[in-house]
């Protein structure tokens, strides 16, 4: 058996490191370097470059292509141009560094100083696309074959410049002719220079040497301010100053007063207030990549640029997507509030006529519409949040209405109930204390009170014709005004109105339910219960017991709740009559009527036991004595005894004046007597039997008659006072002296 030897293949020492494979990027870059070395490193040109290549003189042979090496210490002479290079030799950079360096900075420069230079980079699109551009100074490599540079290049020290970049010399006609390749400078309309305005002299003379200059391109030059260009470019309409280290556009109005297009991208401009100097002509402004960050300056400057159509502000701090600007109302408006809007909306509001913003067409119709609205109202503010809240509020209101709850309708119902309630001063204990609890709920779909009353009246008329109430005018059926819901305890009152023929006419209207109020000390114990009848008679006085004839209560009336009807003729003035005749005017205001009735009843309660003495004083006056015959005729002859026992007041009229008054004017006392008779006459609209107990019915009738007598007393006193003073107007009770042409057709109003 043979022995087998097992060898240990494991390494006893550190393994050698595997060579690192080049990354795909390096392989791609290496292949690109070889490809560029084979065909030239700046062979791909823009359309303008290819056009010039076909004409010849712009692209050199491949042997003249630039080298990536740099030898600053060598001296090379190209034709008539001296190139001073240092003797030192730098190491050749890596291929990756070379290709990136060549792709970013290497320009294709013209062989002739007057030819235009064009970038050989693939990126030929910029804000000034189609126009030749120059590279920045100091970033141009030497030719790679024999250290030579293309024609038109000169370098000194470590800086390589184009021969058209003039340094340290004055601007002369010869220099301008050489740069523009035109012998007649006065006919030049466009020019392109790359100049160092820090070392050049007489730069301001360019405007005088080329007066017809229409377009001037100074990209990649060294210009700190536009003031160095001079003034009086009378025909200059387009100006390019991109990448020129410009920090201010001050003096643009003096430099180019008719400027229409300004391309000033990639500078250090932070203040654009000077653009307002050319606001009448400026239409295009390119300020990309500057240092504009003040929104107040934009709000102050942009609205003045009325003809602006194209604006580029991207690349500035103010145009950042996170930037939020604050707007406020004009200083003239009160209640200033700050609101926040975005940058794009700010520009849209400040410039309503703007068509392009940041190379994008403004197509948002809502933004344009809101901007036009703000322009119309001279305000630069629209709050989208407010519009959103308004729409949501309308939607919520619509949902509430669909659910059946209408807060507006409910509040309106409460207001109606509150306005239709009145103080309970006459029938405190007789009215129910559950009026609010028994009040029907508000329903918009339910018929109105008038419609329900007419329907109920028509049904009651059809069932029994005798139960219909008869009115005072022709005996027509009068609908019973009854509220829907629980029956309210009300009263019925008829008021006569003077018509054209002199006949009284009564109308009926229901008063709203009485509102519950706490009983005052003066009205305590004034209930209408049968047990309080004696107490009420003592308070009313002996004169009222004689003046008021008892009305027998209706035997057929049952205990129940009374209804109330009232006319629209409150006691608020006097009706016209010939001479000095006073009568009550007719008004249709229920509120005034209610207040008058309440005041008359409260006046009776406050007087109390003194009513007898006041009535005796009135009956002893001259006016009352002159009406003895009328009182006897009207059935109130029992009052003559009181008239004979009363003495004359000190201020009474003399007998002659009283006789004259008796002849000219039918007295109010006579009207009072006729009123009492009319209340008892069945044919002229009597008080109907109330739906209550006989005692309560009689009590209510007595109170009504008492109020009529008190009102007539007040009227007589006012008439007497007017006669004594001899004036045409009386300040008491709203009385007015009027005259009428026909005494026979007008008679006092009868209640």
From Swiss-Prot:
Residues 717-738 have a biased composition (Basic and acidic residues). Disruption phenotype: Gene knockout results in significant reduction of flagellar beating and cell swimming, and absence of outer dynein arms in the distal region of flagellum axoneme. Cell motility is characterized by an erratic swimming pattern with altered propagation of the tip-to-base wave, increased frequency of base-to-tip waves, and frequent tumbling typical of outer dynein arm mutants. PROSITE patterns: LRR. Residues 13-22 have a biased composition (Pro residues). It is found in: Cell projection, Cilium, Flagellum. Changing residue 259 to P: Reduced cell motility and reduced number of outer dynein arms. Localizes normally to the distal portion of the flagellum. Keywords: Cell projection, Cilium, Cilium biogenesis/degradation, Flagellum, Leucine-rich repeat, Repeat. Signal peptide: none annotated. One of its GO terms (cellular component) is motile cilium. LRR repeats lie at residues 210-235, 236-256, 258-279, 280-304, 307-328. Its main location: other. GO terms for biological process: cell projection organization. Residues 28-39, 60-87, 456-471, 662-671 have a biased composition (Polar residues). Residues 1-149, 430-538, 645-698, 717-751 are annotated as: Disordered. Residues 739-751 have a biased composition (Acidic residues). Required for the assembly of dynein arms in the distal portion of flagellum axoneme. Belongs to the LRRC56 family. This is Leucine-rich repeat-containing protein 56 homolog. It comes from Trypanosoma brucei brucei (strain 927/4 GUTat10.1).
